[in-house]
Amino acid sequence: MEPITFTARKHPFPNEVSVDFGLQLVGSLPVHSLTTMPMLPWVVAEVRRLSGQSSKKEPGTKPVRLCVSPSGLRCEPEPGKSQQWDPLICSSIFECKPQRVHKLIHNSHDPSYFACLIKNDAANQQSICYVFKADDQTKVPEIISSIRQAGKIARQEELRCPSEFDDTFAKKFEVLFCGRVAVAHRKAPPALIDECIEGFSHVSGGFSSDQSRSALQPPGDGERGPRPMRKSFSQPGLRSLAFRKEFQDAGLRSSSFFSSFEESDIENHLISGHNIVQPTDIEENRTMLFTIGQSEVYLISPDTKKIALQKNFKEISFCSQGIRHVDHFGFICRESSGGGGFHFVCYVFQCTNEALVDEIMMTLKQAFTVAAVQQTAKAPAQLCEGCPLQGLHKLCERIEGMNSSKTKLELQKHLTTLTNQEQATIFEEVQKLRPRNEQRENELIISFLRCLYEEKQKVHIHIGEIKQTSQIAAENIGSELPSSATRFRLDMLKNKAKRSLTESLESILSRGNKARGLQEHSASLDLDSSVSSMFSNTSKEPSGYEKEALPISESCFRLLGSSDDLSSDSESQLTEEPALLSPKQGFRRRANTLSHVPVECQEPPQLVRGSPGVSQRKLVRYHSVSTETPHERKDFESKADHISDASRTPVKTRRHSWRQQIFLRVATPQKACESPKRYEDYSELGELPPRSPLEPVCEDGPFGPVPEEKKRTSHELRELWQKAILQQILLLRMEKENQKLQASENDLLNKRLKLDYEEITPCLKEVTTVWEKILSTPGRSKIKFDMEKMHSAVGQGVPRHHRGEIWKFLAEQYHLKHPFPCKQQPKDTPYKELLKQLTSQQHAILIDLGRTFPTHPYYSAQLGAGQLSLYNILKAYSLLDQEVGYCQGLSFVAGILLLHMGEEEAFNMLKFLMFDMGLRKQYRPDMIILQIQMYQLSRLLHDYHRDLYNHLEEHEIGPSLYAAPWFLTVFASQFPLGFVARVFDMIFLQGSEVIFKVALSLLGSHKPLILQHENLETIVDFIKSTLPNLGLVQMEKTISQVFETDISKQLQAYEVEYHVLQEELIDSSPLSDNQRMDKLEKTNSSLRKQNLDLLEQLQVANGRIQSLEATVEKLLTSESKLKQATLALELERSALLQTVEQLRRQTAELGSQESDPTLPKPSGD
């Protein structure tokens, strides 16, 4: 019986599915890359015209097959029904990525035609317009939709999955973050880095010596000590240099300390910006991974597993290396400040040596150069107002939708703008082709215009490029103009505009209530728009550091009726109200100034014209800024109320005056044209600060009349404060609880992600219960468990979620049974302290991070949490064990440990495996122990599997060709994780000889398959590729064989045999004096190492002897004590026995007297 199958309809392109469409290719035409959508119908018409002119031998349309998929858009010729498609004969017409389809157009007059404009990667190359015809016009929308969907999916894939070039290009370096410096210019002298370092050391010393003084409070004149240094830089613009470094105190989380290089007046202009990188305390980890990408640099903290700083190349303006401190470097970048501007900050870092700094500087230079070239190549071509194609674009927009006659008139008008020669040429070319009708004539004219404008576009220089130098000069001249003269002219023009506008509004007001209603709903009119346009060529917006140098009185503006103005009276308000106008105010956005009608009583013009240095206050959205007095305010309120009451009655629509028509024509369209940022919804009004009663805002808000707020008593204010404080405390508690829940959830997800592998020996519930009972034993770290019981438990299986805890338990049992370490232990340096240092092995570690378990989800993310934790472990061990440092293969060992436990616990277990279990010997730089291990494996094969050994020797295959990764990575680089985890179970139980037993069992169980291969390549490929893909049954069989095998004595014998053979070969071989001397020196060094090892073993043996002797003495002492106790007990026993006998005799005598009354009773004497 066949199984039941069904197919479900899926979304297009779920898994790179290609959709084919049978079409007719009408033709193609190369056009300029700046071709716009209005031009495209005329291009299609030209393609169809050229296709209709083709001869009978070469038909105009070709049957093609259009293949659409997210990976590519391909057009191939259709061979026909009788022929089979052959890729050697039928090559594709074009092939491109779907995101390169720039425009798609569907012909509305003839729905069976559509066209696509394919844009080339290079900006200077031409685009190609392909025109297709479908046999069924109803399929055209489906084809267009499929192409758009394919392009959308392809673009999403590009954003979701970065290219491989990004990962390979990014270079990572470990650096130590020293601090950040606020500077006043984007460039700096070469000695900046050295001065920063000296300033950091001075700041650190000053802060530690005087911790009682607040870090943010500058010292007084009497307390001011000597400055760290004072230097006048010759580079212009570098006026001040301020150090900022953050520390941590017992009472303060972080604080900032400023120390200036310049005179005392510079302290008023210290740059205060947001500290993006929170520099940690000296007691915290300040090491970072400095990563250089294609277009940005970023700092990753391995401690927090987060990006601490990310800067684009555009924001970096200066990079330098220290002159005296050659192991330091830094860069200056732009950062945004709280006021909307920006300032410049220099970040300083330290490396391990000068060579690493040189490499970083070279990498930065290359990255900047490549990014600049790519940015220039990828810059999109744009049209300026003077572009020839811009004129053609506007012409096509004008004639769009016109009939042939009107289009012909527009084209004739446009031709008059050309030169006589160009007009004559176009006229002659059109007459040569003899168009049948006006439409064909129009198409020909557009075609020749397009060719003419495309030729002009090739030699055209954009307006922005021409005026670039002149604009810079004009900006410089404009910035040097006196601000007072500019403000005086601006005030005069504003007053004139205000008077003319007021007169217009008064006439409108007198016309009736209908005009009043229209004015209330119209958009605002910016009084300064014409003025700002007139002064746009002579004024310039100041740059970031120029803004910061402005005094506070010139850069800050206060609104009328704000909280600062409540304390002032009406008279002082009139005199103090105008504020200084900044150059930036001329370019501000339009503000709502017509939400209500101005007062009839105009303020005297001399108030504004009297002082040329003052002007109107800055306008704000939904605020009406004026300079009226409180008395004028009352008059206005009464009149406004009267007008609002009168406006509720219906009024007949009357004809507007010429001033009203001008006003409505100017003001009304602004409401529809303004950007959405300008007109925000009324929900934002609730977040605005409360306005003063003096402020002339509209009385009727969007939600009705605004009630006047009452002044609250102190008791009510106190209750509000208490309520707010309690709510804040509750919110903080809830936030902490949410963070705890989120952290626990992340830990569970992280643990589940780590243990994402298949177990080889699934644990039964009984076995899991046994392990849980063992792990829950109180004081288990001091209790010795039975070895047979532990062997049995490990043999039955280890639960995956308890594996890390079980490994720690087995390590504790090893330390209990071996109280004296068999080898010299490393320094007891805390893990956190090791992470604060820089390692010289960073390059090798960073390279191997991507190679370690690349398919596992925990390590697959580039510089994710898994890779950063693994980097920390390997870095800490390289600093702890200077002799070994880092060796390839250690990343796999540490990676397996990290999957089953935390970061610091994995580091401790790595130390246990390396020093206590003896794995450290095989990672030494000389690799002598690894050679001995290869010899031992060969001898095991010779003794246990002779035929396999002979087969491998026949093809000259030594163990180093296939077994070296097994020993260095403990099978983790080639075998499944479940199998490797079981190998680690046995290593923690039995030691490093487990690796030999597993290798011997694997080769022995696959011996028949290996013997079938008859050459070196196939044998090695089978051992490396096929053999690791074991089945579950074969893996369990291998593990059970390892538990039953004991080869410890053979391994010791083979090691001694290796050393004997090495000495014999050295003595027997005829060598020259130099060679003999070299070998003798090598032998001497190896013998010294052996002597050191023997001395270590001797020390261990002496320690064991001393411990045994001490144990014997303790036992003898306890034995003598026990003997004395036994003797005392025996004496006590004899005394008790005598007492019992006496009691028995007395009892017998008493019994006999009671039975015979004639016997005299014993006297009471």
Curated annotation (Swiss-Prot):
Residues 243-401 form the PID domain. The modification Phosphothreonine is found at T502, T593. Residues 797-991 form the Rab-GAP TBC domain. The modification Phosphotyrosine is found at Y949. Its main location: nucleus. One of its GO terms (cellular component) is nucleus. It holds the Pfam family DUF3350. Coiled coil: none annotated. Residues 629-645 have a biased composition (Basic and acidic residues). The keyword Phosphoprotein applies. Keywords: GTPase activation, Nucleus, Phosphoprotein. Gene3D superfamilies: 1.10.10.2750, Pleckstrin-homology domain (PH domain)/Phosphotyrosine-binding domain (PTB), putative rabgap domain of human tbc1 domain family member 14 like domains, Ypt/Rab-GAP domain of gyp1p, domain 3. Residues 207-234, 624-651, 1146-1165 are annotated as: Disordered. It is found in: Nucleus. The modification Phosphoserine is found at residues 146, 232, 234, 500, 504, 522, 524, 562-563, 567-568, 582, 611, 624, 692, 938. Insulin-stimulated phosphorylation by AKT family kinases stimulates SLC2A4/GLUT4 translocation. May act as a GTPase-activating protein for Rab family protein(s). May play a role in the cell cycle and differentiation of various tissues. Involved in the trafficking and translocation of GLUT4-containing vesicles and insulin-stimulated glucose uptake into cells. Interacts with APPL2 (via BAR domain); interaction is dependent of TBC1D1 phosphorylation at Ser-232; interaction diminishes the phosphorylation of TBC1D1 at Thr-593, resulting in inhibition of SLC2A4/GLUT4 translocation and glucose uptake. This is TBC1 domain family member 1. It comes from Bos taurus (Bovine). The lineage of its organism: Eukaryota, Metazoa, Chordata, Craniata, Vertebrata. The gene is TBC1D1.
